């Protein structure tokens, strides 16, 4: 990795990318990114992808959405916190450590809050900027058979961000689909994010942020991305919940690594 890409320099770059991202109101307020990371750092991430055994299978909607006949989980994750990535080889660990620190930074979080103000104001009111947010970046890997049905995201979440990490532009059709809500309650496809290198999207989670993903076909080897979720961190219950989830996930991850050794 280039020495010049310090955490501070990379944070400044990502903040600038967020500030200059394209905004769209349809079907709900969201941002689109065309170059969230510097090109050379993006290639470092692509080349530093963990091995399949470094990931842990995800549950919940991502598991239930599996279209595989055997029901095998089709989404796996690696949390970008130091205690999770410490098992990676040093050359890969340094890349994901920097990425995680940048995405958890206050500067990046503040940039998202500023740019997503219309959506956050709709949900939280005039004082939206005072609502605490707890960032959790995870590296996700989807395999053929993955799909996720129309949903808005849990209101435990304040902001959803996804950065796509494909090595090339050969599978743009597997990006996330955004749905509009018609007066009769139907939710047809309105637009789709292209699954292209160094791109992505962000939105403030609300009752109208319907999105989905079609089944990933056999033409896709892996659908790699970073999911950056800002959990609402207001009040003692949410404060404890957010941090206890990190600790419990750490225990599950350590048990899995002990079984591997």
Task: Give the residues covered by each predicted segment.
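Catalytic core of non-heme Fe(II) oxygenases with the double-stranded beta-helix
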Residues: 92-228, 232-240
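Short intrinsically disordered coil segments
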Residues: 48-52, 177-181, 240-250
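Fe(II)/2-oxoglutarate
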Residues: 1-26, 243-261
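Residues that form generic nucleotide/phosphate-binding pockets
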Residues: 17, 21, 44, 48, ...
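Amphipathic alpha-helical surface "interface" segments used
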Residues: 64-72, 139-140, 246-253
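Short, flexible segments with low predicted structural confidence
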Residues: 13-17, 83-84, 125-127
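A general structural signal for short secondary-structure boundary/capping elements
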Residues: 76-83, 184-186, 207-211, 246-251
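Non-heme Fe(II)/2-oxoglutarate
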Residues: 20-115
């Amino acid at each position: 990795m280039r020495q010049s890409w310090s955490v501070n320099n990379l944070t400044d770059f990502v903040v600038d990318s967020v500030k200059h991202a394209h905004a769209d109101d349809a079907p709900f307020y969201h941002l689109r990114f065309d170059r969230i990371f510097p090109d050379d750092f993006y290639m470092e991430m692509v080349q530093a992808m963990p091995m399949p055994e470094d990931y842990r299978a995800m549950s919940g909607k991502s598991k239930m959405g599996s279209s595989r006949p055997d029901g095998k989980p089709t989404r796996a994750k690696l949390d970008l916190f130091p205690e999770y990535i410490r098992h990676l080889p040093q050359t890969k660990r340094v890349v994901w450590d920097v990425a995680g620190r940048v995405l958890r930074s206050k500067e990046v979080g503040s940039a998202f809050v500023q740019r997503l103000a219309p959506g956050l104001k709709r949900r939280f009111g005039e004082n939206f900027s005072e609502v605490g947010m707890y960032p959790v970046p995870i590296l996700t890997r989807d395999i053929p058979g993955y799909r996720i049905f129309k949903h808005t995201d849990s209101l435990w979440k304040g902001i959803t961000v996804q950065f796509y990490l494909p090595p090339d532009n050969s599978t743009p059709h597997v990006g996330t689909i955004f749905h509009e809500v018609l007066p009769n309650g139907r939710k047809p496809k309105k637009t789709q994010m292209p699954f292209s290198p160094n791109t992505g999207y962000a939105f403030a989670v609300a009752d109208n942020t319907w999105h989905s993903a079609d089944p990933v076909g056999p033409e896709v080897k892996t659908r790699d991305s970073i999911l950056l979720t800002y959990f609402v961190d207001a009040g003692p219950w949410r404060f404890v919940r957010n941090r206890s989830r990190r600790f419990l996930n750490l225990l599950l991850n350590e048990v899995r690594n002990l079984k591997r050794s």
